[in-house]
Amino acid sequence: MVKFNNIIYDPQVSDKKFPVQASDPEREAKLVVLQPVGYPFVCNLMEAPRIDAVNKELFEIYARDQWEGFRAAEGSYLFDQKLLPDYAFKIIRAHPDGSKITRNTSIILLENDREEFHEVRSSITMDDVIGQEDAKIKCRIIMKYLEDPDRFRDWAPRNVLFHGSPGTGKTMLAKSLANELKVPLYLIKATSLIGEHVGDGARQIHELYELASKTAPSVIFIDEMDAIGLDRRYQSLRGDVSEVVNALLTEMDGINQNWGVVTIGATNNPELLDKAIRSRFEEEIEFKLPDDEERKLMLEKYIETMPLKVDFPVDKLVKLTREMSGRDIKDRVLKTALHRAIAEDSESVRAEHIEYALKERKVSGEPKHMFA
């Protein structure tokens, strides 16, 4: 039974509308994900059934048999014609969208009480990521692999570790990588892989990789890797965490040949990762704090979009924001200063507002939690 309960809401991409390309009605659907919805209407003489696919293979055969030739468009509905006439299933995911269901289409049924796991879509490009030139160069190797997985085979960069200070662009670069190649990106937090019951976490990992394989080439981005992969010297490993780690190692080892799937793990503290997990990453990519020139580019880009004019020299801001990440500059300096100016009904962000933001940041200090 398939469970996808790791949806990541990303306001940067979730609230945007993405144009759907004109579909080819003869193009074969590789994957269709369905969610049980129910009947168009019910009366007090009948009770809406709970739909659970006890046997996934049998459900796929059953579904393909009655819906072969139907067009699978995301957001549309398919109605059962056999066991439960007129019972509706919503098409949550179709890959590619608007394609035709055939005998070769993989069909997955979500549980009634679970939210679907879905890909994150983004319009971010590598040019939007300021700095991190070394990381970008290494990411182009991943791009070459995803463009032609069959060419690389055993030489593929399948498991890559992004590490560095918070807010340095690890997630942003992964989004740009997937967007430029137009491949699915599955973005999850490691802590969400720990299930409520024994076996839940391992099952979710295997099902995640199954989904990624069926939509390959694709990218799986696991954030906060140290939350589950912490070195055993620093924790008493719980059974539910251990099963998640073992399932993840199985997938990363390639026991199930997930050709065309790249796993990117992200952590702020690579030295705290368990050796068994860290050794599975063939490539480690460091994300560094921006230098003076990079901070200047960031500041100019951010200030250009602010709702109030900034009456403060950019060059001076560059010096005042040394050792800060791009996220710190935007959220903890510029945003705090902007909100202070708005609260005072000021027509611009002035020196005193910048000074207030810098003072607030100094008072609050850096987060001490190792997973921050």
UniProtKB/Swiss-Prot annotation:
Which superkingdom is the protein from?
Answer: Archaea
Provide this UniProt record's keywords sorted from A to Z.
ATP-binding, Nucleotide-binding, Proteasome
The record's SUPFAM superfamilies line, in alphabetical order, gives: P-loop containing nucleoside triphosphate hydrolases
Cite a single GO MF annotation.
ATP binding
Answer whether the UniProt record assigns the keyword Flavoprotein to this protein.
no
Q: Which terms does the UniProt entry file under GO BP?
A: proteolysis
Q: Which residues bind ATP?
A: 164-171
Membrane spanning segments where? Answer: none
Disulphide-bonded residues = none
What's one GO-annotated cellular component? proteasome complex
Q: Which PROSITE patterns match?
A: AAA (PS00674)
**Function statement:** The 26S proteasome is involved in the ATP-dependent degradation of ubiquitinated proteins. The regulatory (or ATPase) complex confers ATP dependency and substrate specificity to the 26S complex.
Family designation: Belongs to the AAA ATPase family.
Q: What is this protein called?
A: Putative 26S proteasome regulatory subunit homolog MTH_1011
Say which species the protein is native to.
Methanothermobacter thermautotrophicus (strain ATCC 29096 / DSM 1053 / JCM 10044 / NBRC 100330 / Delta H)
